[in-house]
Amino acid sequence: MTAYPQFDVILKALNLSSVGVIITDPEQKDNPIIFVNTGFENITGYAKEEALGSNCHFLQGDDTDKEEVAKIRHAINEKSTANVLLKNYRKDGTSFMNELTIEPIYDDHEHLYFVGIQKDVTTEHDYQLELEKSLTEIEKLSTPIVPIKENICVLPLIGSLTHDRFQHMSEYVSEYMDHGKEDYLIMDLSGLAEFNEDAVMNLVKFHGFMKLTGVELIITGISPKFAMTLIRYEENLASLTTYSTIKEALQFY
């Protein structure tokens, strides 16, 4: 029997856990691993005998986020907690996303150790990346640029021109214009559900942005209600060319 009868139960519980558990000793040189559970072996593919005595950095690769690693180093130096997301590598060379939490603990003799809890979140991480990719594609669909002539394209806006949408629109148009040869961009506002002062200010900013790119901005589809809002900003938009419809604008270009 051990001095602590509960020890065997605790060890068995740790080895039944699906998460990886590591204990390191920062008071030894290079903070070596002194304990790993079965969950660690299952996640990484490394046997206990291969991991013990090593520093955890053997799981890292060239593309492991250096800033996240620095957070771990800082926590160890400060004897504090850290929560990080690391790209780690299994023994077979395949990568996995490791959601790692480290905590300082002390034994009865005030000897410092660190406990690390590993969770393989590769599936969740990949799902999040796919979701973000899909949202980006949806945003592009909400800002369609339609080539009309060799040097003219149309940007029809539908819905509302929020700050976030304006930011995305500016980035998307900038990227598009960098690869195109357009001299004119017709922005059609006939599909906008609302046109408040924030939208006008965004339009003023976009007008200035287009001037810098050398592309002339033409506005179409301004309703009488929108026109009343624009009057207050007439000085900022004095050089802006407007037409009632896209068809009317194309007669002059």
UniProtKB/Swiss-Prot annotation:
GO terms (molecular function) for this protein are: photoreceptor activity
Q: Which residues carry this modification: S-4a-FMN cysteine?
A: 56
- Tell me which residues make up the PAC domain: 80-133
User: What are the protein's UniProt keywords?
Assistant: Chromophore, Flavoprotein, FMN, Photoreceptor protein, Receptor, Sensory transduction, Transcription, Transcription regulation
Q: How is it modified after translation?
A: FMN binds covalently to cysteine after exposure to blue light and this bond is spontaneously broken in the dark.
* This protein's record includes keyword 4Fe-4S: no
Which residues does the UniProt record annotate as the domain PAS? Answer: 6-79
Which InterPro entries did the record assign?
A: Bact_StressResp_Reg, PAC, PAS, PAS-assoc_C, PAS-like_dom_sf, STAS_dom, STAS_dom_sf
The identity of this protein, by name, is Blue-light photoreceptor
